[in-house]
Curated annotation (Swiss-Prot):
Subunit structure: Monomer.
Disulphide bridges, residue numbers: none
Site (Stabilizes the basic form of H active site to accept a proton): D96
Site feature (Discriminates between blocked and unblocked aminoacyl-tRNA) residues: N13
Reactions catalysed, as given in the entry: an N-acyl-L-alpha-aminoacyl-tRNA + H2O = an N-acyl-L-amino acid + a tRNA + H(+)
Name of this protein: Peptidyl-tRNA hydrolase
One Gene Ontology biological process: protein quality control for misfolded or incompletely synthesized proteins
One Gene Ontology CC term in the entry: cytoplasm
Organism whose genome encodes this protein: Prochlorococcus marinus (strain MIT 9515)
Name of the gene encoding the protein in the UniProt record: pth
Catalytic residues, chain numbering: H23
Subcellular location: Cytoplasm
Domain of life: Bacteria
Length: 199
């Protein structure tokens, strides 16, 4: 790993049926980011991910979309970390969060999975909770205590509405702008900016 490399891993599920789902926000953000720099993703089997890279200022940004399905995200993240011999402070996980309102962002440098199966698997495979994660709120499903789990699954796997997408596009832009400034702004300042953002 070089000092000027930044590793961004967006979580989601591969497959056409999941492309526009709320659970695929990590993928959708990275696709938006890569298009800005005309970068194309290619499948890297050894990394269990689709991958692209581009340069911003003096930094090389490496973007990954795991091809393992959400619940096995840790397999891809561990493969990436081991292959590049990465210090985890250079890794940023992009993930959806059902406990955050739509349009809210939360940057955490460590912590539990919060019930998110993708984060849970990463913690299990890396054997640590100490890694950066940028959580993007997708809001909660309607309350129905008798079908709570079913409601949650259908909500995260459900497609993003056009109204939600309008909000999320602003969120993606804010996160991308913050990631672009990693080499010129203090990380604590970036964390504060993201955590105070709400569209």
């Amino acid at each position: 790993m070089k000092d000027n490399e930044v590793f961004i891993i967006g979580l989601g599920n591969p497959g056409k049926q999941y492309i526009k789902s709320r659970h695929n926000i990590g993928f959708l953000l990275l696709e938006t980011f890569s298009k800005k720099y005309d970068a194309q993703f290619t499948l890297k089997n050894k990394l269990k991910s689709r991958y692209t890279e581009f340069k911003i200022n003096d930094s090389i940004y490496k973007l990954f979309m795991p091809h393992t399905y959400m619940n096995n995200s840790g397999d891809a993240v561990k493969a990436i970390v081991d292959w590049y011999k990465i210090s985890l402070d250079k890794v940023f996980i992009i993930v959806d969060d059902i406990d955050l309102p739509l349009g809210k962002i939360r940057f955490r440098k460590k912590g539990s999975s919060g019930g998110h199966n993708g984060l849970k698997d990463i913690i299990n495979k890396l054997q640590t909770e100490n890694f950066n994660r940028i959580k993007i709120g997708i809001g909660s499903p309607p309350i129905n205590e008798t079908k709570k789990q079913l409601n949650t699954i259908s909500h995260v796997l459900g497609n993003i509405s056009s109204q939600e997408n309008s909000t999320l596009e602003k969120v993606y832009q804010k996160v991308i702008e913050s990631l672009e400034e990693l080499d010129i702004k203090n990380e604590d300042y970036i964390i504060s900016e993201l955590n105070s953002f709400h569209k």
